[in-house]
């Protein structure tokens, strides 16, 4: 077939060269955005008198037809037409005649593809924000059901202090809230229009960029045509935000994997989100959590891939920028899938409250309580720390826990110890007392839940 840009050339490219340079195998995902962008563009051309109203109406009818065909997956794309833009233009000309060739007046594929990607990400980021808030809702529900479920809190993966399981869950709620905030802020940079920037220098036609931007729902336009066609910061920002979101999901998945093991037994995954072994009949593997953890590296890779593509590009457009799309598409699909799986996995998991409770009665996570007990009686905390350290050593040598130590032994360490210290050793009491702002105390968790509901309630119907 003849190329829409073929006037300059006397030889045709080899078929394998065409295939190497074509992007239609993946950028066809932009078909709706491409057609909607073209409808806005030709509407603007008619308003400015660059094409007649009759020509514009004929072009728009043709584009609307192609849009309906696209929604029903009836369009057939060709490698020879290279990309989504030339495929649509070719189909349009075949449908309505040569007047379809006027669509590209005052426009380049450079600003066209940038517009498509802005429209695409604007829509997909909104979807991801919604899916993240749905996951946050699941976390709120689990936290509400586990306010008084006591578990070990960890540092260095060693038992540190008793905490509420709800407090642990809500830590991830606030991580996801930062992710939502980052995505929402990025929309300010996604929601600007490059349409009308041309190949790199603008156009001699009297176009109205603000009008076409308004038709497409953009909040403004790029102020520099070179920047408009060469900018991929908005994609990099999306990939960066998605990498942080996936990192948060991966951290939680790592804990779910540990907690579901025989060594912990804190939770049990629903059969819906676990698999078995082909050889070991007893196995119940947390495959979905492992896959989310693994797919995090995939999203990181997409970020670093585009950063590497961009680092050496002179202004303005370069064919290297064709490599900006597959990682973007892949990240959208990966993040959306992981969010939905994570929500279902957390919603259906069983919390073993008894095992968690046993864990905080068979360790030394209440040691800080004794140090605080002494400090509250006027002993410098460093001295209290030293005394409790010796008590823990004594217990490990005897094979007992702090609650098993007789009062006489405590008094040998410090005369400040009294009978009331055993009340301090209760994990439940230890958690309840930690009512500093943001702490694990039950009153603080109730306050945190109210704030959390306020953030997602309007969006997902929590009252």
Curated annotation (Swiss-Prot):
<dbReference type="GO" id="GO:0006526">
    <property type="term" value="P:L-arginine biosynthetic process"/>
</dbReference>
<dbReference type="InterPro" id="IPR029419">
    <property type="entry name" value="Arg_succ_lyase_C"/>
</dbReference>
<dbReference type="InterPro" id="IPR024083">
    <property type="entry name" value="Fumarase/histidase_N"/>
</dbReference>
<dbReference type="InterPro" id="IPR020557">
    <property type="entry name" value="Fumarate_lyase_CS"/>
</dbReference>
<keyword id="KW-0028">Amino-acid biosynthesis</keyword>
<dbReference type="Pfam" id="PF00206">
    <property type="entry name" value="Lyase_1"/>
</dbReference>
<keyword id="KW-0963">Cytoplasm</keyword>
<keyword id="KW-0456">Lyase</keyword>
<dbReference type="InterPro" id="IPR009049">
    <property type="entry name" value="Argininosuccinate_lyase"/>
</dbReference>
<comment type="pathway">
    <text>Amino-acid biosynthesis; L-arginine biosynthesis; L-arginine from L-ornithine and carbamoyl phosphate: step 3/3.</text>
</comment>
<dbReference type="InterPro" id="IPR000362">
    <property type="entry name" value="Fumarate_lyase_fam"/>
</dbReference>
<dbReference type="GO" id="GO:0005829">
    <property type="term" value="C:cytosol"/>
</dbReference>
<dbReference type="Pfam" id="PF14698">
    <property type="entry name" value="ASL_C2"/>
</dbReference>
<comment type="similarity">
    <text>Belongs to the lyase 1 family. Argininosuccinate lyase subfamily.</text>
</comment>
<dbReference type="InterPro" id="IPR022761">
    <property type="entry name" value="Fumarate_lyase_N"/>
</dbReference>
<protein>
    <recommendedName>
        <fullName>Argininosuccinate lyase</fullName>
        <ecNumber>4.3.2.1</ecNumber>
    </recommendedName>
</protein>
<dbReference type="InterPro" id="IPR008948">
    <property type="entry name" value="L-Aspartase-like"/>
</dbReference>
<dbReference type="GO" id="GO:0004056">
    <property type="term" value="F:argininosuccinate lyase activity"/>
</dbReference>
<dbReference type="GO" id="GO:0042450">
    <property type="term" value="P:arginine biosynthetic process via ornithine"/>
</dbReference>
<keyword id="KW-0055">Arginine biosynthesis</keyword>
């Amino acid at each position: 077939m003849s190329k829409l840009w073929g006037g300059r050339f006397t030889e045709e490219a080899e078929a394998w060269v065409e295939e190497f340079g074509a992007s239609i195998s993946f950028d066809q995902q932009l078909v709706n955005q491409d057609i909607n962008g073209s409808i806005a563009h030709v509407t603007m051309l008619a308003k400015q008198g660059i094409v007649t109203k009759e020509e514009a109406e004929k072009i728009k009818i043709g584009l609307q037809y192609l849009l309906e065909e696209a929604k029903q997956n009836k369009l057939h794309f060709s490698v020879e037409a290279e990309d989504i833009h030339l495929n649509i233009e070719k189909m349009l000309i075949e449908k309505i005649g040569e007047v379809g060739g006027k669509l590209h007046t005052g426009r380049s594929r450079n600003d066209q593809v940038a517009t498509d990607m802005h429209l695409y990400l604007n829509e997909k980021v909104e979807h991801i924000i919604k899916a993240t808030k749905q996951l946050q809702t699941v976390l709120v529900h689990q936290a509400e059901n586990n306010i008084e479920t006591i578990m070990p809190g960890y540092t260095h993966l060693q038992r540190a202090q008793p905490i509420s399981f709800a407090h642990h869950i809500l830590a991830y709620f606030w991580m996801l809230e930062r992710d939502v905030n980052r995505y929402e802020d990025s929309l300010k940079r996604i929601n600007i229009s490059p349409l009308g920037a041309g190949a790199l220098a603008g156009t001699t036609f009297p176009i109205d960029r603000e009008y076409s931007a308004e038709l497409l729902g953009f909040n403004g336009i790029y102020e520099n045509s070179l920047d408009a066609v060469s900018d991929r910061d908005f994609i990099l920002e999306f990939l960066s935000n998605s990498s942080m979101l996936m990192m948060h999901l991966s951290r939680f998945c790592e804990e779910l994997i540990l907690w579901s093991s025989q060594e912990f037994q804190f939770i049990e995954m629903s059969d819906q989100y676990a698999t078995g072994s082909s050889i070991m009949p007893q196995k119940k593997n947390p495959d979905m959590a492992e896959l989310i953890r693994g797919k995090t590296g995939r999203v990181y890779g997409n970020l670093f891939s585009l950063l590497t593509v961009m680092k050496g590009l002179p202004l303005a457009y370069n064919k290297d920028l064709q490599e900006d799309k597959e990682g973007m598409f892949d990240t959208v699909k990966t993040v959306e899938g992981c969010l939905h799986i994570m929500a279902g996995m957390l919603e259906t998991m069983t919390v073993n409250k008894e095992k968690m409770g046993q864990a905080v009665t068979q360790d030394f996570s209440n040691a800080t309580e004794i140090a605080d007990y002494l400090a509250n009686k006027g002993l410098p905390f460093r001295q209290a720390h030293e005394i409790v350290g010796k008590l823990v050593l004594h217990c490990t040598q005897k094979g007992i826990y702090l609650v098993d130590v007789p009062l006489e032994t405590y008094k040998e360490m410090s005369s400040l110890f009294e009978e009331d210290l055993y009340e301090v050793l209760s994990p439940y009491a230890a958690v309840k007392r930690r009512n500093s702002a943001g702490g694990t105390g039950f009153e603080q968790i109730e306050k945190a839940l109210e704030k959390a509901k306020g953030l997602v309630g309007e969006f997902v119907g929590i009252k």
